[in-house]
Design a protein with these regions (language model features):
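Conserved, mostly hydrophobic/aromatic
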Residues: 60, 163, 254, 306, ...
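Active-site groove signature of glycoside hydrolases
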Residues: 219-220, 261-262, 341-375, 402, ...
Length: 727
């Protein structure tokens, strides 16, 4: 995940939520362009079949960005539960003004003293975990201790957990879950005599009422002092530590794989600290995002997450501050037999059966100036090669992916200018072309190459502006504002997929061995982003991502893996509930009907897409994304048994568009079924606690003949029963 100055593109909000605000003045879709023909025709050739859709087509990526994982997936209710931060009454106690509900829930909470600050001491003498543990000094009958507020509680819900304590025999400790004022606004557990050594005590609560201002208090009276090693509180219905609501929804999305750990975080990640008893894993400061990580969701928890969701893991190793030895040992921990040193450690941690993780990515965005441990390409390929050899020595069966960056990434994202190249433009196979660098210098030491892309709404890249160093609203040089129609807005991110495909085909031309060795591309980070954030994904964004999916399905010969940023951006989430948002609804729609094993077929038409207006490097791109059915976007595929033909049609205009369908190589033998995803307008969205504004409805198609009436502002999946045409 790219890093930027904190003031640029409301960074944390964009990365945590990947939400796109509505663009003022573009609430309604526009009519179809006048230049398109009155009668749009599409011809599907069922005899021209591409390789099947990979089971990894709709994968997910998530990063340890501040509290993102811990709010959305992990069920722990307490922040800093192992006390990295000093506990004082100072510092901000409320979120800054203007923070929306969705962003507010991702802000980290702090512990505060109960009573004067002087009675809470961060003691470095024999800490339970990390550098210190809080010591609470006591003063007879006046309670002293610590408190964390801002907890969301549900009335009647049970909560379980534990606390690790030690102290003097004269200390009397109470732990309270607080939901209101007075003695009736809390449930208190009295801990018995404290031992000299740290001991774990169970916690069980039931909240009588619901509140978003709940708290946990740990206080003591008596004489001497007591120390708190760690504390944990989760809803009792957690599933192996994870939220049951978000897990259940994510199981429905046919993700194929989840990439974790990954992102900028991984370049400062010590995987050794993320295994073993959770209470004893040290909390650390993640320097990539300048935030504390508890290490609670570590390597074994990631495997549990994948099992619960029903997907495969994909691990990125630390090639920033990390080394080949630790990466190889990480492979051994995950995949090694119990007879190996790290396999035995995994078994002692409760997981005797090897995980057999297949996909491994060496490094995250090593080309980026933002990446911790960055070095030049000529040195990094040496590092990659060392990592690859060491990791394959441990497990020769793993699939290794190199972290590439094509000329579009280097040019459009401003990386070349950051490196002070003489020419801002990055030609193919120049010293700044990382993807070509692997093809030249790491051949045989990777099976696939990763590519990341983030397309930005409301701006376009201009090479001349970039050369002059012009910056717009803190973005990299070269981005200039642009007025877009809705159709242009919706089509924009799919053009980035298409550009990646054109570049890949150029590499295949220069390096023919790529095809023979089945070298594949993985877009294992991608998103459509914009400045600011409001209320999250909507129908307009779903239309854009549908065109992204369609473009991905046109390149199944080499684009075999993709991972959406972020995986939980498919959900609308509150602290106590979650629903599929429009992103999630779209992933489910395509996973259900255009998923693994489907066979894309050739599509032609009579209405070409507009040509590119910009060619930032080497004349690329040559064409734009989409089918020749403008303003519609159409992709088609046969079912694995070839008994059904499925069409995905995206209509971002405000009118129904007639589409005349011709099928070659097969004949339609029965009634057509339509799954239609739409809403009342482009801002329609699905939110927690509200009736869904965007739905997928199964519709019987009544049109006679071969003309389909494609509904306005909709994503439409048509399925036709087919049989081979007689010869």
């Amino acid at each position: 995940m790219k890093g930027m100055d904190p003031m640029r593109i409301t960074r944390i909000a964009t990365l945590c939520l990947m939400v796109i605000p509505a663009v003022p003045g573009l609430v309604h879709a526009q009519a179809a362009a006048a230049s398109s023909p009155k009668k749009i025709e599409v011809t599907v050739d069922a005899a021209q079949v591409s390789p099947p859709v990979s089971k990894y087509e709709y994968g997910m990526f998530i990063e340890h960005i501040r509290t993102l994982i811990y709010r959305s997936l992990w069920a722990e209710m307490l922040d800093d539960r192992k006390f990295y931060h000093p506990i004082t009454s100072g510092g901000p106690k409320a979120p800054p003004g203007g923070v929306t509900r969705r962003f507010r829930m991702f802000l980290s909470r702090r512990w505060r003293p109960v009573g004067p600050d002087a009675f809470v001491v961060m003691d470095t003498e024999q800490p339970f975990v990390g550098e210190h543990s809080p010591r609470i000094d006591l003063d007879s009958s006046v309670p002293h201790g610590i408190r964390q507020g801002g907890l969301t509680l549900v009335g009647g819900k049970r909560y379980t957990g534990h606390i690790v304590l030690r102290g003097n025999s004269g200390a009397r400790v109470k732990v309270s879950l607080v939901w209101g004022e007075g003695p009736n606004g809390r449930q208190t557990i009295t801990i018995g005599a404290l031992p000299v050594a740290y001991q774990e005590f169970p916690l069980r609560f039931t909240s009588r009422v619901g509140t978003s201002e709940g708290a946990l208090e740990i206080t003591g009276t008596g004489s001497g002092s007591f120390r708190i090693g760690a504390v944990s509180v989760m809803p009792a219905d957690n599933v192996d530590g994870f939220r049951p609501d978000t897990i259940a929804l994510l199981r429905r999305l046919h993700s194929g794989f989840w990439r974790l750990p990954g992102g900028n975080f991984v370049s400062d990640f010590n995987w050794y600290d993320s295994v073993g008893p959770r209470d004893k894993r040290p909390p650390i400061l993640d320097h990539a995002w300048n935030a504390v990580q508890s290490n609670d969701v570590g390597m074994d928890e990631f495997m549990t997450l994948c099992k619960l969701i029903g997907t495969e893991p994909y691990i990125t190793v630390n090639a920033g501050f990390g080394d080949a030895h630790s990466a190889a040992e990480e492979v051994e921990y995950m995949n090694g037999a119990v007879s190996t040193r790290l396999g035995a450690l995994r078994a002692r941690n409760g997981h005797p059966v090897p995980y057999h993780v297949k996909f491994w990515n060496i490094g995250n965005e090593p080309y980026g100036p933002w990446e911790l441990g960055r070095t030049d390409l000529k040195y990094y390929v040496l590092k990659h090669n060392e990592f690859a050899r060491a990791m394959r020595k441990v497990d020769p069966s793993i699939v290794l992916l190199a972290s590439g960056a094509m000329p579009d990434e280097e040019t459009i994202e401003g990386i070349a200018s950051e490196l002070h190249l003489k020419d801002y433009q990055v030609p193919f196979c120049s010293d700044a072309d990382w993807t070509c660098g692997y093809l030249k210098h790491s051949w045989g030491l990777f099976d696939g190459i990763t590519e990341h892309w983030y397309s930005r709404a409301g701006v376009r890249f201009d090479l001349e502006a970039a050369k002059k160093g012009k910056r717009y609203q803190g973005m990299e040089a070269g981005y200039v504002p642009v007025k877009q129609t809705v159709l242009q807005w919706v089509r924009k991110p799919s053009n980035r997929v298409h550009l990646k495909a054109e570049e890949w085909q150029e590499y295949e031309r220069r390096f023919p061995g790529m095809i023979k060795k089945h070298i594949f591309m993985s877009n294992d980070e991608y998103a459509y982003t914009a400045r600011g954030f409001r209320e999250g994904p909507n129908l307009k964004l779903a239309l854009a991502y549908a065109m992204v999916f369609n473009e991905m399905l046109r390149h199944t010969d080499f684009l075999r893996m993709t991972a959406f940023t972020m995986g939980v951006s498919t959900l609308d989430i509150s602290p106590v509930a979650a629903v599929l948002n429009t992103n999630g609804l779209l992933f489910k729609l395509y996973g259900d009907h255009m998923g693994a094993g489907m066979l894309p077929v050739a599509v032609t038409g009579n209405s070409p897409q507009p040509l590119p207006e910009q060619h930032p490097f080497d004349g690329f791109p040559h064409t734009n994304a989409g089918s020749p059915t403008y303003p519609l976007d159409v992709v088609a595929a046969l079912s694995p048994d070839r008994k059904h033909l499925t069409l995905s049609v995206v209509n971002a205009t405000d009118s129904a568009v007639p589409l005349t369908l011709h099928v070659n190589g097969a004949r339609v033998t029965g009634k057509t079924t339509l799954w239609k995803m739409t809403g009342k307008d482009l801002n329609a969205a699905n939110r927690v606690g509200q009736s869904p504004q965007v739905q997928v409805k199964k519709v019987a198609v009544t049109e006679a003949g071969n003309v389909l009436s494609v509904p306005p502002i909709s994503v439409d999946i048509y399925r036709f029963p087919v049989a081979p045409r007689p010869q």
